[in-house]
Amino acid sequence: MEKLTMLVLVAAVLLSAQVMVQGDGDQPADRDAVPRDDNPGGTIGKIMNVLLPSGCPWNPWCG
């Protein structure tokens, strides 16, 4: 009975090690990627970038 218990424990350890090595095959490669913020100012910043492409609301003083 002790040999059977040891065999079951060894099989469980090997199986868990195999699962850890293989990992999740169905997950995309970029699951940890952070989406890039193209408009850090939000909607207002996007509108201002269209209206004033230089990004400066005071055109004469922006050099």
From Swiss-Prot:
GO terms under cellular component: extracellular region
Modification type D-tryptophan: residues: W58
Disulfide bonds: C56-C62
Main localization, broad class: secreted
Any one GO MF annotation of this record: ion channel inhibitor activity
Keywords in alphabetical order: Amidation, D-amino acid, Disulfide bond, Hydroxylation, Ion channel impairing toxin, Neurotoxin, Secreted, Signal, Toxin
Annotated localization: Secreted
This protein's record includes keyword Secreted: yes
Prosegment location in residue numbers: 24-54
Family: Belongs to the O2 superfamily. Contryphan family.
Task of the protein: Its target is unknown, but this toxin may modulate voltage-activated calcium channels (Cav) or calcium-dependent potassium channels (KCa).
UniProt name for this protein: Contryphan-Li1
Organism: Conus lividus
